[in-house]
Amino acid sequence: MHGFSNKQHDGFLGHSYICEWVNLGANTNNSNLKNNYGNVRFFLGDINVETNKKFIGVMMGDYSKSGISTMFNTGTYVGVGANIFGGGFQKKMIQSFKWGKDDLTDLDKFIETCKIIKSRRGQALHHSEISLLKYIYKNNK
């Protein structure tokens, strides 16, 4: 788990990779082992990555969030700025800036929220970061 990310409540995040400024809701859980004990695969867009590993949890990009009791399957990938919530297991590949299961985040509201998130920790959202987030949003597939 990288800096300024937040996991304050119950839940399991075994063998996961959590980037910066991620907020994980209470009881967010992931599986980290397939039921058939096979190697874990995960998806990056259209690319299917064979890891040759038995244990991999969720990988979450910067500024992503999960709601209360969110469940991630083994080898789930969550892009930048996604706000994940809703019952049942989530999709294994969640694109950047996803809102819930089917919608996209409003970019202007997202940037304002990022400013609030960082200001709570005495940090500022710099113009270079805003430019990068806009680039990722524009090129999101």
Could you tell me what each predicted segment is?
Residues 1-141:
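Glycine-rich hexapeptide-repeat left-handed beta-helix
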